[in-house]
From Swiss-Prot:
The active site is at residue 13. This is Selenide, water dikinase. It is an enzyme of class 2 (transferase). It catalyses: hydrogenselenide + ATP + H2O = selenophosphate + AMP + phosphate + 2 H(+). Synthesizes selenophosphate from selenide and ATP. The lineage of its organism: Bacteria, Bacillati, Bacillota, Clostridia, Eubacteriales. The keyword Transferase applies. One of its GO terms (cellular component) is cytoplasm. The record marks 16 as: Important for catalytic activity. Gene3D superfamilies: PurM-like C-terminal domain, PurM-like, N-terminal domain. It comes from Desulfitobacterium hafniense (strain DSM 10664 / DCB-2).
Length: 340
């Protein structure tokens, strides 16, 4: 059987359409109005939120992509963790999911079974129910989930509502996209691959559960657009976010790979999108690339009031030891993002 990696031109969230191109396409769609639709696609948030009654809202999201690893079950776990993440990023809890499958007709069907088994493992860990799905034949394997969850409509974690004085917490290390590019090029060290796989398979459930004990002003998960583009979305039009590159958690080998100009196409699309929104100044090139690197099943970026940020960080580090304070929120300046 032809390997997963050799059969796919790209993998994971690095396969996402770039943020600039996607914005142009979505701008031509009608904006649907419904008083119960609390978060729609026009908000560029992580999931849709639809209110059912005073105390309950449904959160709905979908995510799928091509493999970035050879092992089918590992791929299934990563894809499921990534799809579930959007529910956690909104402050919700997943209820049920549907499989989304594209699979080559000539590939071993047992490998598809392994993919689905890996996804089911993560759904069980999340406490969600698998209810069915849809499958088609395709030239490249693709897998993901449509996930439905619930939350209190008064406690939605939107991605663009930080407040001046907030501090930013990132719950997972950066660099998985660069490491996966090195793996595809057969240049990745075993320790780097192990760290990246562990991060991508880790549910954001545990960080979200710790964060719920604190007032969260804004939240998003870091995926294919990279830290900088997701931070740009969080800043919106009314605040500026200062990031501290020296405080960023990252997979150590990813810095070395970036230093050797082992880059990703998606990272360069992200760089183009950020032109005019950030000045890198004397920030070392490898750190620039880590901030632009497309993450698959990346961590949560939480905007927390400054007076409880350290306490929140300590709580989150009980389950996510690499979590770090990486920035702060200011009133609007000349740029949406500054590097400190």
């Amino acid at each position: 059987m032809k390997s997963f990696l050799s059969s796919c031109t790209t993998g994971g969230c690095g396969a996402k359409i770039g943020p600039g191109e996607l914005s142009k396409v979505l701008s031509g769609l009608p904006v649907f109005q419904d008083p119960q639709l609390l978060v729609g696609f026009d908000a560029s948030d992580d999931a849709a939120v639809y209110q059912i009654n005073e105390d309950t809202a449904i959160v709905s999201t979908v995510d799928f992509f091509t493999p970035m690893v050879e092992d089918p079950r590992t791929f299934g776990r990563i894809a499921a963790a990534n799809a579930l993440s959007d529910v956690y990023a909104m402050g919700g809890s997943p209820l049920f999911a549907l499989n989304l499958v594209c699979y080559p007709e000539r590939e071993d069907i047992q490998d598809l079974g392994e993919i689905l088994a890996g996804g089911a493992e993560k759904l069980q860990e999340a406490g969600a129910v698998l209810c069915g799905g849809h499958s088609i034949y395709d030239r490249e394997p693709k897998y993901g989930l449509a996930v439905t969850g619930r939350l209190n409509p008064r406690q939605i974690w939107k991605n663009n509502t930080p407040q001046p004085g907030d501090r930013l917490i990132l719950t997972k290390p950066l660099g998985v996209g660069i490491v996966m590019a090195a793996l595809r090029g057969e240049m990745a060290e075993a320790a780097a691959v192990e760290a990246a796989l562990a991060s991508m398979q880790r549910l954001n459930k545990y960080a979200a559960e710790k964060a719920r004990d604190f007032p969260i002003h804004a939240c998003t998960d870091i995926t294919g657009f990279g830290l900088l583009a997701h931070t740009r979305e969080m800043a919106g039009g009314s605040t500026t976010i200062v990031l501290y590159p020296s405080a960023l958690p990252y997979i150590a080998q990813a810095y070395t790979y970036a230093q050797g100009y082992l880059l990703t196409a998606a990272g360069q699309r992200n760089r183009n999108f950020m032109e005019g929104a950030v000045e890198f100044g004397d920030t070392p090139f490898p750190l620039q690339e880590l901030m632009l690197d497309p993450q698959t099943s990346g961590g949560l970026l939480l905007s927390v009031p400054g007076d409880c940020a350290q306490e929140a960080l300590r709580a989150i580090q009980e389950t996510e030891p690499q979590a770090a304070l990486i920035g702060e929120v200011l009133p609007r300046q000349d740029f949406p993002i500054l590097l400190g």
